[in-house]
């Protein structure tokens, strides 16, 4: 038995993170503290100053754990990661972990490429973004590609020139200057990259002036073809500027403007992204579990969770209200960025007006979201209420688990479990099972096996649904009885056209009305569990089909196998390859080339 009062006496005064747990050992809250002793004790002292949310949490605390850190900054980083991992019930939690694309210019290469990426690496390349509008990113990349003939391949240029590799089609259709041929200098190629970087850096007007000067100069010197090239670039640049520009701001800094609206147990945070003095995008985020948490606490939670996931940190955060832990958050953001980051709360002027505009957008979105969410809630909870009534359940089936067995031509049986919590897919709870004890195609015994294995772990569901009829239900019913478990159990059966028809148990059969929310809900569960099983089965089958004799060679993994097959086209060509030819393959060293060469020579002997 965990004695809370005794453990409170043993708390250290150092900074760290504490984890509150309920009687099921679930983490229900994660927090950080400068002094663990002072902070954790506050929860168990007089509750008169506690919010209703904290009072509710304290009632459910069965025990607590803590992790000591060297500093408050380390505690903040650990807190962010633990909240992301466990999504505790009483923390304010960001509903979606959104990541955004960047445009990467591979300036760490002699002949750079332009790519769309999701991660920013410390690789000496240049990154631009993040961009919230993916369509705009794709349009920008397409315009760059159509305007500038830069390479898109990963080929080693020096090796291609040395081996006189045949250039790809892009050279012949004027989509690439063809640096792999050795006919374009780094300086000539670099001029194109400089223009692209100017455009992506927000210096479009300066680039426009430069291109117009070059066009006029070419025209005056009767180089009309060259002038036409500059004219086309200017036209593309004007189109790009039109797509990227939304509005101008009072500063040319990179800034994020953050404001919030709240209602009931949810809050909406709206962020406007400003890059080089222009609003390049906006995004909304829904926070759950806010209840009666102070605004300063909610905004602080958002900043921690959102920027913990972002690769790019702006120079300045403009926030509508003061937030908790402002100074330590500035320190953390600065350490992530590698230079000073400032959090500002404007009191007047244009920045204050900008924050107000962002807040109005947050209010408008939350109103729409709340109406939409209310309709969804009524639809989903309505289906659960109907399910409770029609199956004569004692309580609402908050957690529903559905099972299916998949095999192809009677072999490699796979079991799958999907989970619905409050009528929503709970994908982190999905599980797959390889059948261990059943030989051959036997859906009944296979279904019994996976449910038996499932019952050995975790909290039990309120309702079990099987993709099948009376046979599957009877087999699993025996498993429940052997495990001394009483869980409502029903099969989901289909009609002659293989469409969901109704629910069945040992004693009765219920045909569902196709016009109801309940029918649509059950049909979606049956389709989900079936697809989950089939998808996994396909991946196993594809993996088996791609197995090759190359898998038996020491040092050859998926990456090198792919490189070998791309280079030589088939295994027969690899068998005949010389050591010199093997060493030309990407990612190949002498030791691995020896292994490949000797493997096929031994095979011949």
Swiss-Prot record:
<dbReference type="GO" id="GO:0009381">
    <property type="term" value="F:excinuclease ABC activity"/>
</dbReference>
<dbReference type="InterPro" id="IPR000305">
    <property type="entry name" value="GIY-YIG_endonuc"/>
</dbReference>
<dbReference type="GO" id="GO:0009380">
    <property type="term" value="C:excinuclease repair complex"/>
</dbReference>
<dbReference type="Pfam" id="PF12826">
    <property type="entry name" value="HHH_2"/>
</dbReference>
<dbReference type="InterPro" id="IPR036876">
    <property type="entry name" value="UVR_dom_sf"/>
</dbReference>
<dbReference type="InterPro" id="IPR010994">
    <property type="entry name" value="RuvA_2-like"/>
</dbReference>
<keyword id="KW-0228">DNA excision</keyword>
<comment type="similarity">
    <text>Belongs to the UvrC family.</text>
</comment>
<protein>
    <recommendedName>
        <fullName>UvrABC system protein C</fullName>
    </recommendedName>
</protein>
<dbReference type="InterPro" id="IPR038476">
    <property type="entry name" value="UvrC_RNase_H_dom_sf"/>
</dbReference>
<keyword id="KW-0742">SOS response</keyword>
<dbReference type="Pfam" id="PF08459">
    <property type="entry name" value="UvrC_RNaseH_dom"/>
</dbReference>
<comment type="function">
    <text>The UvrABC repair system catalyzes the recognition and processing of DNA lesions. UvrC both incises the 5' and 3' sides of the lesion. The N-terminal half is responsible for the 3' incision and the C-terminal half is responsible for the 5' incision.</text>
</comment>
<dbReference type="Pfam" id="PF02151">
    <property type="entry name" value="UVR"/>
</dbReference>
<dbReference type="GO" id="GO:0009432">
    <property type="term" value="P:SOS response"/>
</dbReference>
<dbReference type="InterPro" id="IPR004791">
    <property type="entry name" value="UvrC"/>
</dbReference>
<keyword id="KW-0267">Excision nuclease</keyword>
<dbReference type="GO" id="GO:0006289">
    <property type="term" value="P:nucleotide-excision repair"/>
</dbReference>
<dbReference type="InterPro" id="IPR003583">
    <property type="entry name" value="Hlx-hairpin-Hlx_DNA-bd_motif"/>
</dbReference>
<keyword id="KW-0234">DNA repair</keyword>
<dbReference type="GO" id="GO:0005737">
    <property type="term" value="C:cytoplasm"/>
</dbReference>
<dbReference type="Pfam" id="PF22920">
    <property type="entry name" value="UvrC_RNaseH"/>
</dbReference>
<dbReference type="InterPro" id="IPR001162">
    <property type="entry name" value="UvrC_RNase_H_dom"/>
</dbReference>
<dbReference type="InterPro" id="IPR035901">
    <property type="entry name" value="GIY-YIG_endonuc_sf"/>
</dbReference>
<dbReference type="InterPro" id="IPR050066">
    <property type="entry name" value="UvrABC_protein_C"/>
</dbReference>
<dbReference type="GO" id="GO:0003677">
    <property type="term" value="F:DNA binding"/>
</dbReference>
<dbReference type="InterPro" id="IPR001943">
    <property type="entry name" value="UVR_dom"/>
</dbReference>
<feature type="domain" description="GIY-YIG">
    <location>
        <begin position="13"/>
        <end position="92"/>
    </location>
</feature>
<feature type="domain" description="UVR">
    <location>
        <begin position="205"/>
        <end position="240"/>
    </location>
</feature>
<dbReference type="InterPro" id="IPR047296">
    <property type="entry name" value="GIY-YIG_UvrC_Cho"/>
</dbReference>
<dbReference type="Pfam" id="PF01541">
    <property type="entry name" value="GIY-YIG"/>
</dbReference>
<keyword id="KW-0227">DNA damage</keyword>
<dbReference type="InterPro" id="IPR041663">
    <property type="entry name" value="DisA/LigA_HHH"/>
</dbReference>
<comment type="subunit">
    <text>Interacts with UvrB in an incision complex.</text>
</comment>
<keyword id="KW-0963">Cytoplasm</keyword>
């Amino acid at each position: 038995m965990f004695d809370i009062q005794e453990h409170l006496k043993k708390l250290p005064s150092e900074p760290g993170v504490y984890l509150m747990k309920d009687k099921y050992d679930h983490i229900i809250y994660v927090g950080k503290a400068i002094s663990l002793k002072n902070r954790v004790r506050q929860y168990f002292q007089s509750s008169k100053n506690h919010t209703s949310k904290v009072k509710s949490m304290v009632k459910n605390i069965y025990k607590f754990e803590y992790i000591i850190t060297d500093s408050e900054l380390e505690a903040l980083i650990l807190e962010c990661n633990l909240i992301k991992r466990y999504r505790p019930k009483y923390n304010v939690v960001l509903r979606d972990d959104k990541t955004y694309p960047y445009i990467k210019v591979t300036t760490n290469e002699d002949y750079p490429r332009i790519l769309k990426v999701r991660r920013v690496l410390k690789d000496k390349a240049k990154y631009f973004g993040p961009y919230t509008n993916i369509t705009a990113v794709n349009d920008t990349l397409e315009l760059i590609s159509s305007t500038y003939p830069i390479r898109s391949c990963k080929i080693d240029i020096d090796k291609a020139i040395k081996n006189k590799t045949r250039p790809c089609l892009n050279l012949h259709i004027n989509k690439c200057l063809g640096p792999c041929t050795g006919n374009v200098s780094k300086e000539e190629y670099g001029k194109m990259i400089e223009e692209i970087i100017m455009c992506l850096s927000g210096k479009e007007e300066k680039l426009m002036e430069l291109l117009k000067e070059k066009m006029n100069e070419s025209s005056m010197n009767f180089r009309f073809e060259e002038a036409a090239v500059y004219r086309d670039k200017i036209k593309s640049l004007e189109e790009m500027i039109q797509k990227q520009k939304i509005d101008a701001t009072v500063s040319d800094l990179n800034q994020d403007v953050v404001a919030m609206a709240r209602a009931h147990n949810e809050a909406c945070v709206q962020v406007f992204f400003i890059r080089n003095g222009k609003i390049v995008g906006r995004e909304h985020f829904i926070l759950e579990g806010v209840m009666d948490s102070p605004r300063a606490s909610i905004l602080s939670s958002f900043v921690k969770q959102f920027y913990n996931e972002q690769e790019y940190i702006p120079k300045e955060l403009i926030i509508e209200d003061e937030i908790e832990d402002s100074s330590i958050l500035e320190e953390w953001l600065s350490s992530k960025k590698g230079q000073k980051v400032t959090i500002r709360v404007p009191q007047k002027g244009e920045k204050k007006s900008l924050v107000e505009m962002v807040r109005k957008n947050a209010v408008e979105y939350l109103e729409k979201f709340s109406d939409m969410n209310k309709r969804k809630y009524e639809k989903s909870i309505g289906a659960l209420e109907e399910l409770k009534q029609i199956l004569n359940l004692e309580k609402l089936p908050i957690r529903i688990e559905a099972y299916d067995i998949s095999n192809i031509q009677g072999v490699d049986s796979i079991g799958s479990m999907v989970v619905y919590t409050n009528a929503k897919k709970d994908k982190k709870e999905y599980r797959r099972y390889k059948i261990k004890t059943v030989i051959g195609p036997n859906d009944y015994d296979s279904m019994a096996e996976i449910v038996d294995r499932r019952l050995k772990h975790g909290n039990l569901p309120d309702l079990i649904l099987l993709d099948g009829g009376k046979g599957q239900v009877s087999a699993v019913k025996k498993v429940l009885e052997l495990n001394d478990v009483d869980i409502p159990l029903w099969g989901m059966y289909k009609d002659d056209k293989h469409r969901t028809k109704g629910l069945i148990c040992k004693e009765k059969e219920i045909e569902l009305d196709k016009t109801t929310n309940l029918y649509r809900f059950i049909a979606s569960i049956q389709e989900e569990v079936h697809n989950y099983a089939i998808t996994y089965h396909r991946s196993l089958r594809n993996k088996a089909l791609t197995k090759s004799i190359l898998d038996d060679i020491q040092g050859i993994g998926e990456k090198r196998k792919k490189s070998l097959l791309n280079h030589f086209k088939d295994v027969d060509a690899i068998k005949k390859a010389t050591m010199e030819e093997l060493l030309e393959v990407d990612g190949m060293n002498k030791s691995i080339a020896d292994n490949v060469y000797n493997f096929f020579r031994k095979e011949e002997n």
